[in-house]
A protein has these predicted regions:
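N-terminal leader/linker segments that initiate helical-solenoid repeat arrays
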Residues: 19-78, 82
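Structural signature of tandem alpha-helical TPR/SEL1-like repeats
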Residues: 48-55, 82-91, 118-144, 168-180, ...
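Terminal, low-structured helical/coil segments at or just beyond the last alpha-helical repeat
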Residues: 60, 201-240
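Canonical positions in the second alpha-helix
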Residues: 61, 95, 145-146, 180-181, ...
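Helix-start (N-cap) detector for alpha-helical repeat units in TPR-like alpha-solenoids
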Residues: 69, 103-104, 154-155, 189-190, ...
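Canonical tetratricopeptide repeat
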Residues: 74, 108, 159, 194, ...
Length: 240
């Protein structure tokens, strides 16, 4: 515990020195040498000892940075649980600076951006929905990045499908992602409903009807079955 505290204290001192005008890199290096007890090694043993100490310093800093990234992710999920989507979005963005290849973080960015689009009002009365649209495009980009990292990531596939169908009004784009999600999680009723809607909105009525039939066959809930039957009737009426 004391070692961890010392790591963060050392980092804080280094950042403070860098932020002060007129402080050179030589000053920072001199402080580091004092901390490690290394000055100007010349012999083989002194050089080996200096290398070992600085390797340990690098490992300590990497450990500290890794932990900071994890804490930002946890902070983001806490904000998300409390429906503080703007703060959650900021925390996940910070976490991505430490873990830029983490598909879960991109997924959470997509979720938060989607929620923030609902709160994006035209406060300047400009007559445009630019802020809302920007959040929606951020959500799209985040989901796509998550899928690029893990192409079988069902939650991201589903989230992107919902975005295309209900927010961006691009149901044709949703279909391949939702179909892939269904091929992985074959009994996910939520995905089935969104895919059926995507087919309907794309005028693929036969596929929409077939998907509602699949929901009716799969579900054990009377309410879910009733909803699927009602939606199926709407599609049948539209197909004639």
């Amino acid at each position: 515990m004391n070692k961890i505290k010392w790591i963060f204290l050392t980092l804080a001192i280094s950042f403070a020195l860098v932020s002060c005008g007129g402080v050179s890199n030589k000053t920072i290096i001199r402080h580091q040498k004092m901390e490690e007890g290394v000055d100007s090694p010349t012999s083989i043993e002194e050089l080996k000892d200096a290398i070992k100490k600085y390797q340990e310093r690098v490992a300590d800093v990497q450990l500290a940075q890794s932990q900071i990234g994890i804490w930002y992710k946890i902070l983001g999920t806490r904000y998300l649980d409390n429906k503080m989507y703007g703060e959650a979005l900021k925390a996940f963005q910070e976490a991505l600076t430490y873990y830029p290849d983490n598909q879960n973080l991109y997924y959470y960015v997509g979720v938060c951006a989607g929620y923030m689009s609902h709160a994006a009002l035209d406060y300047n009365a400009s007559g445009t929905n630019e802020v809302k649209y920007n959040y929606l495009k951020l959500a799209e980009e985040a989901y796509l990045r998550a899928i690029a990292i893990e192409d079988r990531y069902v939650r991201a596939l589903y989230g992107l499908g919902v975005l295309y169908v209900f927010e961006l009004d691009e149901p044709e784009k949703a279909i391949p992602y939702l179909e892939k999600a269904i091929s992985i999680d074959t009994k996910n009723l939520d995905t089935m409903f969104v895919l059926a809607r995507a087919y309907y909105s794309s005028y693929e009525f036969d596929k929409s009807i077939a998907m509602y039939d699949k929901i009716i066959e799969t579900t054990k809930s009377d309410d879910t079955k009733k909803t699927a039957e009602e939606n199926k009737k709407i599609v049948l009426d539209a197909s004639y």
